[in-house]
Regions:
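Hydrophobic alpha-helical transmembrane segments of polytopic membrane proteins
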Residues: 129-143
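General alpha-helical segment detector with a strong preference for membrane-spanning helices
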Residues: 97-100, 140
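Hydrophobic positions on the alpha1 helix immediately C-terminal to the Walker A/P-loop
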Residues: 103
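Predominantly long cytosolic amphipathic alpha-helical stalk/bundle segments
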Residues: 6-98, 106-118, 145-172
Length: 172
């Protein structure tokens, strides 16, 4: 997902800087796009057009503020999806620990019922405990790795948007 989104911001910037004007570029963009860069740019252009009759300092300040707000809004939309990964990464080890306790309790129960401590009696509960621990750790590790990767890619993407916003502000 983020490989595509990071290449889309690069493509967006290339097209912008090749365009004859910001207005012509804005008109060439799709009206209903879910690309955050396009959403942010369209809001900035709407403010630019709306404040055309004001002084350049006021216009620049207002467009800059719109760029900040729109970037923050789009970033929150993307980051809300990280909650699940963060939750899995932090709770999965505890679920694994619960499974471990459950498996050990089953082993003790088997010992009590059979009044025998042989490996054949104890092993199934211990295997159950180790399996639960392994699943909990595997889920946590995968979730944390995915969270860190997506977070890093998101930060890189929005850093590119912020840099574009600064360059765009410098030319209006």
């Amino acid at each position: 997902m983020f490989k595509n989104i990071n290449s889309s911001i690069e493509e967006f910037e290339k097209k912008f800087w090749k365009a004859k004007s910001a207005e012509s570029f804005n008109n060439s963009l799709p009206a209903n796009s879910d690309d955050p860069a396009i959403q942010i740019f369209k809001l900035a252009m709407a403010e630019l057009i709306k404040t055309k009759r004001q002084s350049s300092a006021i216009q620049s300040a207002r467009v800059g503020r719109i760029l900040e707000i729109a970037t923050d809004t789009e970033m929150k939309k993307v980051e809300k999806n990280f909650t699940f990964l963060a939750t899995v990464g932090s709770t999965a080890p505890f679920i694994g620990l619960f499974g471990t306790v459950w498996g050990i309790m089953n082993s003790f129960q088997s010992i009590a019922i059979s009044r025998n401590t042989s490996l054949a009696i104890v092993a199934p509960g211990i295997a159950e405990a180790l399996f639960a621990t392994a699943l909990g750790l595997l889920a946590a590790i995968l979730a944390v790795v995915a969270y860190n990767k997506f977070n890093s890619d998101t930060q890189r993407y929005f850093s590119k948007i912020e840099n574009f916003s600064k360059r765009f502000l410098s030319i209006i």
